[in-house]
Amino acid sequence: MVYSPKTSTTTTTLSLLLIATHLISIIPSTQASPASSSSQWSDNALRSVERAEALGSAVKTSLVRRAGGYNSPLDNGGYMLTIVNGTYPAGLGEPLNVILSADSDKEVLVKSLDDGGFLNYMLVAGQGEECLGQHLGSDQSANLGDGKGNVTEVEELRYNYGNPYIGTCQETFNGGLHLRYWIQNTTNAYFMAVSVEMDLNSGHDIVPNGYNLGRDQLVGNLTGQAIDTNTLTNTSTFSGTGSYENYTYQTDVQYVSGLLKNSSDDINHYLTVEENGRPAIDGLVAVLTVKITARPQSSGAWSAIPQIPMITVLVPLLLSAILSLF
C-alpha cells in the first residue's frame, strides 16, 4: 500500500484527545456555533459531496495564470506537489490544489483570526486549527519556487464539525476535510494541499478521489454552494459569499489547468485514491480571489470573548494540570 508515515501517538496526546472528546459533548452546540456565522456547510452536505465521483476533464496543457495573483512554482524550480518523507515508492507528494490569490484583500492574506484574517476566513468553511494545539499528522514540505527552497507547512487545518472551539478534535478521530498550507514569499499567495482523509483508525489515509473532493468541498463551503466534481473543467467559475464573526467574504473561484497533471503519477496514496479507472487527481487547481464586503463595527479577538462558553476558558488550565501528571 502506498502511504506516508504518521507521527507516533504518545500516551499524553491520546489522553488529551480523549478529554477533548468528552468536552465536545459538554459544550452546547448552540453556543459552539457563533450566531454571526452564516456559512452554509453542514455534516449532511459534507457527506453528500464526499460521495461524488472522480473526474478527469482537465485537458488543456498550457498554464493558465491569474496575473499578479500568484507565481507558478514550476517557473522557478518549484513543485506543485508537496514533499512527503518516507513514501513507498519514494518521491510521492500531495497536490497543491487550491491557491488563495494575492489579488485578495490584504487582510485576508494575514495569518490571523483578527481583522478578517486568513484563519477567520477559513472558519467560514469550518476549517480550524488543530485539536488543542496537538499536531498528529506528519509534516510535509513544499517548494513554491520563491527562493526559499523546501519549506515545512505553516500548519494543518481540520474540519470542526460545527464546533469552532474544539470540534477539530472530532476530525482527528473521525477524519474529514483538512488542509495544509504554505505562503509564497514572492507574492504572499497561499498554496493549499486539500483532501478528505479517513479516520484515525485507518491512519488518516486519503479517501477514494479524496484530493478532488477535498478541493471542491472547500470551494463549496466558502461559496455556499454544492460543487459537482464530475462537471468541472478549466473554464469553471464560481462566486459566493460566507460570513464569520460579522466579516462577510466574497469569494470568486477560477478552476485552472496546467499547474497539475491529470494523472496518478507521483501522487501519494494513488492506489487507494484512484476511483473507477480515473486518475488520482484531475489536474485542476481552484484559485480563490477574496474580498471583504462587510465588517463588524469593532474588530479583534476580544470582541468575541463574551460568546465563548466558560468551559473553553478553563480548558487550558485543565490541560496544564493533566500534563503535570505525565
Q: What do these predicted ranges mean?
A:
Residues M1, S15-H22, A32, S299-S303:
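Short, conserved catalytic/metal-binding micro-motifs enriched in Asp/Glu and His
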Residues Y3-L14, Q307-P309:
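Bacterial N-terminal signal peptides that target proteins for export
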Residues P5, T13, T30, L323-F326:
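Intrinsic disorder/low-complexity signal
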Residues T7, T30, S36, G91, ...:
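Intrinsically disordered, low-complexity segments enriched in proline/serine/threonine
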Residues T9-S29, T289, V313-L319:
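Cleavable N-terminal signal peptides of Sec/SRP-targeted secreted and luminal proteins
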Residues T13-L17, H22, A45, A54, ...:
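Acidic/proline-rich low-complexity IDRs
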Residues S25-L288:
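Mature extracellular/extracytoplasmic regions of secreted and cell-surface glycoproteins
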Residues V285-F326:
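Cleavable C-terminal sorting propeptides in eukaryotic secreted/cell-surface proteins
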